[in-house]
A protein has these predicted regions:
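Residue-level signal for short hydrophobic patches within transmembrane helices
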Residues: 15-34, 38, 61, 65-68, ...
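Transmembrane helical elements of multi-pass membrane transporters/channels
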Residues: 20-39, 141, 175, 204-208, ...
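Transmembrane alpha-helix boundary and packing residues in multipass membrane permease domains
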Residues: 25, 29, 41, 78, ...
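Helix-terminus/linker motif at the lipid-water interface of multi-pass membrane proteins
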Residues: 34-53, 122-129, 185-192, 252-285, ...
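Small-residue-rich hydrophobic transmembrane alpha-helices
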Residues: 52-112, 149-168, 275-339, 372-386, ...
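Short runs within selected transmembrane alpha-helices of multi-pass transporters and secretion channels
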Residues: 73, 141-160, 168-176, 197-212, ...
Length: 454
């Protein structure tokens, strides 16, 4: 496997190994944020606040689908990482094969289901009448491109499980730049309105996914499977789905709470949607960085668990906790100091009302970034040793907390209660995961280092 330029995460100083792996992922996530920001900025500044609200009103449901895709493909990647850490090339190839099969079948089901549910989804989200048609157009096109999202995440998670976090970064950078160019072309000279922004996103990701797959096949000989290895194995698929589906559902459950928040914001009106969307876009900066380190710790823990190195797992988790705490403090301070520049990035001559909605969100959520970092670290560490029930239970608790604030407390306390739903959900989920992590690590230290069966 050395010829494949894979990376062994079971050796070296934990924080250096994790940081070296995570930095390209952070770079990729920042570019991903860049093109979503560019998407919103181009839409808002060329088409107006209503167009920005139309795109923003779909953000949560698009993220909901994306989270399930990332969870499903990420779960498959965990098993691949464990096999790679154990040096079992046969299982690595089996994992690659079944990941492709699962991705192909899932793409068909997901695309048909999502495209047929656009109207019910928009009604559920209380989408305002004045932006309904634009919102429908944007969301339907994005759903048509689900296949590109599935296969990009599939190949990215396969490569990361093999220790390569740079190749996905390079193609994400390409996709980001292409997306911005297509945004401008489709919206300005072609006058395609929000449909242009949607098609730009879909085409950019599809091209990136295709090129990434071709490049990976040329670079990594371990991905060259024989016809026999491509045969579908129900047993192998079930092993992957037992990890992938709980992770997908877990990440989607988190988004259900965000859907409740979006619905509550939509009830307030277009100004609230615009302010909430602008603040949420820059808030994603910290979330994406934390998620990138979470991907790093997931692959690190999976490989070391496969190699039976429990001490390295504990050190790596602690090092990640310290890194994220420092980064979240710095990013939080930057966002709060620069909050007055957020809305003008997306809307020309914004009203005072839109500015206030954005400010309220940031000053409510940003001070609690510490809990987000800890949540992502402990959740991914627990998942990567094969335990899926605890992270899923934590997500159910998180869902209940978000719905309580967004749907119940927002009635008497208004918009601020919707904003507070996010940090409150982080804290409640973390209260379960930390004790579970401590107990789990003690059991593994006691010699029970076989893969957890759920």
């Amino acid at each position: 496997m050395a010829k494949d330029r894979t990376k062994d995460l079971t050796r070296g100083t934990p924080w250096k190994v994790i940081a070296g792996f995570s930095l390209p992922v952070i770079g990729g996530n920042l570019f991903q944020l860049f093109y979503t920001l560019a998407d919103s900025m181009i839409v808002g500044r060329t088409l107006g606040a209503d167009a920005l609200a139309a795109v923003g009103a779909t953000a949560t449901i698009v993220y909901f689908v994306l989270c399930f895709i990332q969870g499903l493909t990420g779960g498959c990647g965990i098993l691949l990482g464990q096999a790679f850490g154990a040096g079992n090339e046969k299982q690595v190839r089996e994992s690659v094969s079944v990941s492709v099969w699962i991705s192909a079948l899932f793409t068909i089901v997901l695309t048909v289901l999502c495209c047929s549910m656009v109207h019910p989804i928009l009604r559920m989200l209380n989408t305002p009448v004045d932006i309904y048609d634009r919102t429908y157009t944007y969301l339907f096109i994005i759903f048509l491109g689900n296949g590109a999202t599935v296969f990009y995440n599939m190949i990215s998670n396969i490569l990361r499980a093999l220790g390569d976090s740079r190749t996905p970064l390079y193609f994400l950078i390409f996709s980001s730049l292409l997306n911005v160019v297509l945004d401008v072309v489709f919206i300005v000279p072609f006058d395609m309105d929000v449909a242009g922004a949607a098609w730009a996103t879909v085409l950019a990701q599809a091209i990136s996914a295709a090129l990434c797959i071709v490049f990976a096949l040329k670079r990594f000989t371990i991905l060259h499977l024989s016809a026999r290895e491509w045969r579908f194995s129900a047993e192998t698929a079930w092993r992957h789905l037992k990890v992938g589906f709980p992770m997908g559902f877990q990440m989607s459950v988190m988004c259900i709470g965000q859907l409740a928040m979006q619905a509550a914001v939509n009830r307030i009106g277009t100004s609230a949607i615009a302010g909430y969307t602008a603040a949420n876009k820059v808030d994603q900066l910290s979330v994406l960085v934390d998620n990138a380190v979470g991907i790093g710790i997931a692959n690190y823990v999976a490989q070391n668990y496969g190699a039976g190195k429990m001490d390295r797992i504990k050190k790596g988790v602690w090092h990640c906790f310290l890194m994220l705490t420092a980064m979240n403090f710095a990013m939080g301070a930057l966002l709060l100091l620069g909050q007055s520049f957020v809305v003008p990035m997306f809307v020309t001559n914004p009203t005072a009302e839109i500015m206030q909605y954005s400010k309220d969100y940031l000053f409510t959520v940003v001070p609690f970034y510490f809990f987000l970092g800890a949540l992502l670290i402990y959740r991914t560490a627990i998942q990567s040793v094969g335990n899926t029930w605890a992270p899923f239970a934590a997500c159910v608790i998180e869902l209940a907390a978000r719905i309580l604030c967004a749907s119940v407390l927002s009635v008497p306390f208004g918009y601020r209660a919707v904003c507070f739903a996010t940090p409150f959900a982080w804290l409640t989920a973390l209260s379960l995961l930390i004790p579970v992590y401590i107990v789990l690590i003690r059991k593994l230290d006691g010699g029970q280092s076989t893969q957890t069966k759920n």
